Amino acid sequence: MNKIQLHISLSKEELKTALSRYHYEDADFLLFFQVYEKIMEQAAPAGMYASAAGGMRCQDAVKKGSVTAEEGEERSLPVIVSLGSWPDRLQEEYALRGMLTESFMAECICLELLLKAYEDMNGKIREKYGWRVKKMLFPGGELPLEAMEKIFGSIGQEEVRYNRYYVLTPKKSVAYQAVLTRKEGEACAGICVSCPRTDCPNRRAEEEKYRRRDALWPDISGMALPYGYQRIFHRNAAAQEERREKNE
């Protein structure tokens, strides 16, 4: 297992953009910034992945849907990205104190930080191995949920765990299979809706998939989300099933 500390942050301009994206007012910026600073006090963003020699080919992961035979011949790397346990503890503290606005702001800010973490992790892989990340395949999206088991088994770490419903702890964690390429023009910046590369075939496919949706950025109060966001917010069938079982 290889572990890399990720160096991520949000500038004030990026925070202002996020503030607008999540439908806050300019007057909310001071509180939004204070929550961001609180998160960054103890956040420990890290990326974990199998060694290059242990990298799986796509066909070794159980595939469905959009994973084609041609893509199955490309090299890939199992990856876990996490912000650590502090954001979970902070949100719990906010909730216990009835600070629901701060808790919701923390959720929004952590989404932005995870998008940054994807980008930084992709860059670290390129620096270390000379391979660029072409596409990210997520269990429960492009891969079946059961692919989570092989990703975790290949990496062999204990900081992030999953339960029988494949819900991750710490919650601000994501597991995926990074498909690699040597071609610079095929490199993926991150989740499609945050990427400026409008010519990217991955983005065009994503836009076609969601072309009937009005907004690219999610309303996390209940709207169905594109899969990259579902993984961050854990909105998958397994998590829903777990909640239903607890309520019965």
Provide a role label for each language-model segment:
Residues 1-98, 102, 214-241, 247-248:
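Active-site helix-to-loop segments that bind/position phosphate- or nucleotide-bearing substrates
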Residues 17, 34-41, 108, 123, ...:
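Charged/polar, solvent-exposed surface patches and flexible loops
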Residues 30, 34, 112, 116, ...:
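Conserved active-site and cofactor/substrate-binding residues in soluble primary-metabolism enzymes
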Residues 41, 45-52, 119, 131, ...:
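Intrinsically disordered or highly flexible coil/loop and linker segments, enriched in small
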Residues 58, 108-110, 188:
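Generic recognition of cysteine residues
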Residues 72-138:
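Conserved mixed alpha/beta catalytic, RNA-binding, or beta-rich assembly cores of soluble enzyme
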Residues 132-204, 216-248:
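Short terminal or interdomain "cap/linker" segment that borders an active site or interface and mediates
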Residues 206-213:
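Composition- and surface-driven signal marking solvent-exposed, interaction-prone regions
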